[in-house]
Amino acid sequence: NMERFRSRGKMDKLVYIIDLDGTVWEDTPNEIAHTHTKDAKLFDNAIEWINKKYDEGNYICLFTARTEALKKITEDKLNTIGLKYHQLMLNKPRLRHTEFKGYHYIDNCAVLKSSRFEGVWSDLVEKDLKITVFKDD
């Protein structure tokens, strides 16, 4: 998928890695996802925002803590709501019932951005924030 994407001259675009539960639609934990996914309420503008990024040529990767057992119901929901994406990745480590407070993503990519979703899909803006980086030797 990424090789085909690169060969189309998309190197100026971004890969958006987007969670589903609590981000695209209301939180439906794995324990209730079989019965609640179909009717899970979408966050306003989520579909429009993501589909716009897709249409602009960006790569959309959905990364969720849902398990392989929930793949079909998840894909059915995505098809029903018309969300455009390139890749669905399941089995993201779950934080819900652990002592961990968040994710820390490490990559060799020169451009790395992170946006905490707080319930509103709107334009992304730049802010000067303190970040954690590896110490230079």
Label every model-predicted segment:
Residues 3-137:
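HAD-like aspartate-dependent phosphatase fold
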